[in-house]
């Protein structure tokens, strides 16, 4: 019945490209398409501490650095430290990378923390008043590394007055003795620890639990936990 004729398809070389061929507002419109009204943002889900990343970035964009720091410190006692050494799992999941590059989430967090460290009156989280039985109990925490200091921080926010025992002469554990200064400056660690002291946390350095003092002796001194 005659030769088969296929419809001719335009090739790239046949197409006159110009501004009429693309959407100048692609970035913003693409972001709206990938935005959901509910659920957890991928960046927050990827963060080991589940910090409210969208919240503090929005506050920082409005210049509300104290509010942004307050939001961060609900979950993270050491934003300046994390700003220096964080693995940035949040940025790896940032949906902005589908358009161009992920947001500089970690740098924003570090910037917020730096604004506070430069301030004459630094932000000290509000402590819940001791209004329940047992809040005056003495609590001993062994070691002043990230885990020990975090434990002391959240206990202090609940109204307790924990005591941190550190065998070394300096506080901070691996943050101070294990991470080189070019990655994490010691002044940054010390600045974070100063806020813990403002919360009423007591520190005893040069005391090795199990050698200089035993658990039984701590019990005798009135420590309940």
Go through each PLM region and give its residues.
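Ferredoxin-type iron-sulfur electron-transfer modules and their immediate structural context
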Residues: 1-133, 186, 223
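Beta1-alpha1 glycine-rich phosphate/pyrophosphate-binding loop at the start
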Residues: 16-20, 50-61, 69-70, 75, ...
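Extended interfacial segments that mediate partner engagement and assembly in macromolecular machines
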Residues: 116-158
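Core beta-strand elements of the Rossmann-like FAD/NAD(P) dinucleotide-binding domain
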Residues: 219-225
């Amino acid at each position: 019945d005659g030769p088969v004729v296929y419809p001719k398809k335009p090739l790239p070389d046949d197409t006159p490209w110009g501004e009429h061929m693309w959407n100048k507002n692609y970035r913003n419109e693409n972001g709206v398409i990938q935005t959901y009204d509910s659920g957890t943002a991928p960046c927050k889900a990827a963060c080991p501490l589940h910090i409210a990343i969208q919240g503090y970035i929005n506050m920082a964009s409005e210049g509300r650095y104290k509010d942004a720091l307050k939001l961060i410190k609900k979950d993270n006692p050491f934003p300046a430290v994390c700003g220096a050494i964080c693995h940035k799992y949040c940025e790896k999941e940032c949906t902005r990378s589908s358009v161009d590059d992920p947001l500089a989430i970690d740098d924003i967090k570090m910037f917020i923390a730096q604004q506070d460290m430069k301030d004459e009156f630094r932000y000290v989280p509000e402590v819940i008043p001791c209004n329940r039985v047992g809040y005056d109990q003495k609590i001993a925490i062994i070691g002043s590394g990230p885990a020990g200091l975090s434990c002391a921080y959240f206990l202090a926010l609940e109204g307790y007055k924990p005591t941190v025992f550190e065998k070394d002469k300096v506080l901070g554990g691996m943050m101070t003795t294990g991470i080189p200064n070019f990655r994490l400056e010691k002044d940054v660690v010390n600045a974070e620890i100063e806020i813990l002291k403002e919360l009423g946390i007591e520190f005893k350095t040069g005391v090795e639990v199990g050698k200089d003092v035993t658990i039984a002796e701590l019990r005798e001194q009135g420590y309940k936990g």
